[in-house]
Amino acid sequence: MKLSFTTKGWDSVSFDEFCRIACDTGFQGIELHGIDNPMFTSRGGPFSEYSAAATVRKMHETGLSIPCIDAVCDISAEDADAAAAHITECIKKASELRIPYVRVHAAESEDAAAAAAKSRAL
């Protein structure tokens, strides 16, 4: 079994440090929370259009992977259009980086809102 940890809540840690922590502690993966965070996507960031391929290659060489991107939205919220747009962007980025999963979350049990966001995103 492979284990990964999330970057959620670790706003002051660099991606290189995440990789070092994963290797040092025996984790095999890093789950990206907030892929649109400037820490990840700004020029020179590990997942900018210029750096993403090299970052994924470096991770593969060190035995690390990114099992999923965490969508930072609530699919049970009333604004299904905004949630769907964010999920669609996460799916696009996951596809570009060959990340197999996008994780979504629902803070409430609003089945209709969650279903609407899912159908709009897909």
Q: Where does each model-flagged region fall?
A:
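Glycine-/proline-rich flexible loop or hinge segments
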Residues: 35-42, 68-76
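Hydrophobic pocket-lining residues within nucleotide cofactor-binding pockets
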Residues: 10
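Catalytic domains of carbohydrate-active enzymes, especially glycoside hydrolases
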Residues: 16-36, 93-98
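Hydrophobic faces of well-ordered beta-strands that scaffold small-molecule active sites
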Residues: 3-7, 30-32, 66-71, 102-104
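Glycine-rich, proline-tolerant flexible connector loops at the mouths of alpha/beta enzymes
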Residues: 31-60, 107-110
